[in-house]
């Protein structure tokens, strides 16, 4: 099933970006490569229920099962042993990636209190964008009564853009709300 944002990209974003940046053909136009959603769960090493509930929440939000990240070495001051669970990662590609970005831009971000837009400074210099979300409640799929604790997540959007200017133009065509 073709996602709404994917068809919008094909029909409107590509011609607009070709006109703006004077690309020779449509294969030079930057596109989304993947979206990586990461959640660090510090207390998951002591409590298995935390890992289970966060995994369930993340799979509801992303509609894809996450991979548990484990510690690489033991750190006594954090009460952490080697290979203990410390987080969850989901990598979205294809239709699920476009569906998640569409829900993030049009449903989740507008639900944030006092939201004025996402930062323009979160580009990495190579056309990729990262943002941190402070709570999972901004997604309409998450029920307030069923969460045990408010936890955030990091969202990294990887594009094929060579510069931040190209990536920002791509995100603006998708309707990403940037601060002035």
Curated annotation (Swiss-Prot):
Source organism superkingdom: Eukaryota
SUPFAM superfamilies: RL5-like
GO cellular component assignments: chloroplast; ribonucleoprotein complex; ribosome
Keywords on record: Chloroplast, Plastid, Ribonucleoprotein, Ribosomal protein, RNA-binding, rRNA-binding
Matching Gene3D superfamilies: 3.30.1440.10
Compartments it resides in: Plastid, Chloroplast
UniProt GO BP: translation
GO molecular function, one term: rRNA binding
Pfam family, any one: Ribosomal_L5
NCBIfam families in alphabetical order: PRK00010.1
Role, per record: Binds 5S rRNA, forms part of the central protuberance of the 50S subunit.
Family according to the record: Belongs to the universal ribosomal protein uL5 family.
Subunit structure: Part of the 50S ribosomal subunit; contacts the 5S rRNA.
Name of the protein this chain belongs to: Large ribosomal subunit protein uL5c
Organism expressing this protein natively: Chlorella vulgaris (Green alga)
Name of the gene: rpl5
